[in-house]
């Protein structure tokens, strides 16, 4: 009961602070005695009893009192005329904007502290989770991701590090006893942490077990996160995947019966091709990647750019008229493995992982394996031509 009461009190405080934050945000862009100031001062009166009970809100209480004093000063200066009064009003208006900014910062800091505490507490619940706990955790994780997406904030980063949030997230991700949907939401939160500050959190990704967990989870969502992390972390992450022997697992997902998993695995393969060093590329080719790509290109979801020309004619016959880029994008949405062998070869060619001499050698090996994998001379000729001349979406 006490815990419930504390939650209710926090919700009441949060509701008041959100209203104060909105009013102070509006006041920064228009620091004049308008509806925002009126709302802020009314809220200051209403929230006095709430703010006085929380020591961490004492600075906010001080800023609100200062704002009231400054607004009174501005109102008094309007009754007078002359240069001095004009300058006073200008300075006072600037002070209102500054104090409003301080109010917003203090409120956000309080909200961040509460949010990180709630996140750490929710992540500490051992599985199995009740339906209510699962929904609450997913909601808290979504809120956390949204906060991180607003950009870097040093105070927030300090809270995250002090609360060891990354370690808690990783613990949930690698624990197969948690529901898949929870682990996927945790994966998205980890990805957002890397975007928030790659320099601080990438080391924990490379040294921990998160990458192996993403691959073993083998869902379209986990592969989407993996693909994003490869883009962010580049060659070092590909090196880690290769050293763990997990490249073959990603390639095997190209043979999944779920097209969404196949597509995301293909995206991962393309990113690995761009950033992978020779050891990684060699491992992928030895894992029979080229034969698998040829099979995918031959499938209903495959095709080549020549087929795209025929598809364009059919679309025009139906009355569709679009720019070429839009038509290409729509074609690849419905044929995600079109020209996939050449697209992989292009990634190697333009990528950062291979030296020029290595690129030439790998291209020759790809051509050889294409000829071995094709079921007809015509198919081989088409794919070889695409690889030689380049084919990209």
Please tell me what each predicted stretch does.
Residues 1-105, 109, 113, 329-393:
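Long C-terminal extensions of eukaryotic subunits of large macromolecular complexes
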Residues 3-5, 26-27, 50, 122-131, ...:
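Helix-loop junctions that connect tandem helical modules in alpha-solenoid scaffolds
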Residues 5-8, 12, 28, 35, ...:
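Short amphipathic alpha-helical molecular recognition features
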Residues 46, 50, 77, 126, ...:
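Residue-level signature of the C-terminal ends
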Residues 66-69, 73-198:
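Alpha-solenoid helical-repeat scaffolds
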Residues 133-146, 178-194, 218-228, 257-271, ...:
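Alpha-helical solenoid repeats of the armadillo/HEAT superfamily
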Residues 159-168, 204-219, 240-249, 279-300, ...:
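Alpha-helical scaffold repeats of the Armadillo/HEAT/TPR superfamily
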